[in-house]
Amino acid sequence: MKGILGRKVEMTQVFTANGKLVPVTVVEVQPNTILQVKTLETNGYVATQLGVFDKRENLVNKPELGQFKKANSVPKRFVKEIRNMEGFEVGSVISASDIFETGQYVDVTGISKGKGFAGAIKRHNYSRGPMAHGSGYHRGIGSMGAIINRIFKSKKMAGHMGHVKRTVQNLEVIAIDNNIMLVKGSIPGPNKGFVTIKANVKGLSNTQAAELLVRNAPVATEAPIEAPVVEEVVSTEE
């Protein structure tokens, strides 16, 4: 498992090599610094801690500053470890092109946009009631169960919506250039939100597999037609 940290910039659209217009998310992936390498013998599991985007020293406490100095690095704003990522040394720097390549599929994890306190219709896609003047309710939750003295746990009701960790899987990498990565489709979070990009863990859907098969199919070329060889007949008659 390999991954890298970045920051969402915006969404736009680009044309592919075959002329297809696809929506993409622009992700800023500055070089990541390896802050710590965890091994099975020392920590009980394998992981690599990454850091990206510099931060002033007066914004970190002494224990955090000591950890950054061990890696010969300045303080970082976004620090996260990725499990089962090994083969790197503390203090080294990696870029997006070292981890991924164009055409590869990745999983992107981020914090979704917060919506605040939302009703059941917005939060759980409930149907609203009749909107006529004689109806008893319009956007109410309605019945909450058949037992009158209690409400079951996990009942879908109004409450806090958004601002949770979400992962979008199997997104295609359209391009990587100059610390910028273009990922097909949308990713969680607002603009300038931090995201974690890792190699995909699940297989592709039928549509994605078909597109990949068509894109990697060899181009058929016609072989040149050779002219037939005409043997010269020598006459022996005088």
Curated annotation (Swiss-Prot):
MF annotations from Gene Ontology: rRNA binding; structural constituent of ribosome
A cellular component annotation (GO) from this entry: cytosolic large ribosomal subunit
UniProt superkingdom: Bacteria
Sorted UniProt keywords: Ribonucleoprotein, Ribosomal protein, RNA-binding, rRNA-binding
UniProt cross-references to Pfam families, sorted A to Z: Ribosomal_L3
SUPFAM superfamilies: Translation proteins (SSF50447)
Coiled coil region boundaries: none
InterPro entries: Ribosomal_uL3, Ribosomal_uL3_bac/org-type, Ribosomal_uL3_CS, Transl_B-barrel_sf
BP GO annotations: translation
Record-stated family: Belongs to the universal ribosomal protein uL3 family.
HAMAP family for this protein: Ribosomal_uL3_B (MF_01325_B)
Quaternary data: Part of the 50S ribosomal subunit. Forms a cluster with proteins L14 and L19.
Record function comment: One of the primary rRNA binding proteins, it binds directly near the 3'-end of the 23S rRNA, where it nucleates assembly of the 50S subunit.
NCBIfam families for this protein: L3_bact
Name used for this protein in its record: Large ribosomal subunit protein uL3
Species this chain originates from: Mesoplasma florum (strain ATCC 33453 / NBRC 100688 / NCTC 11704 / L1)
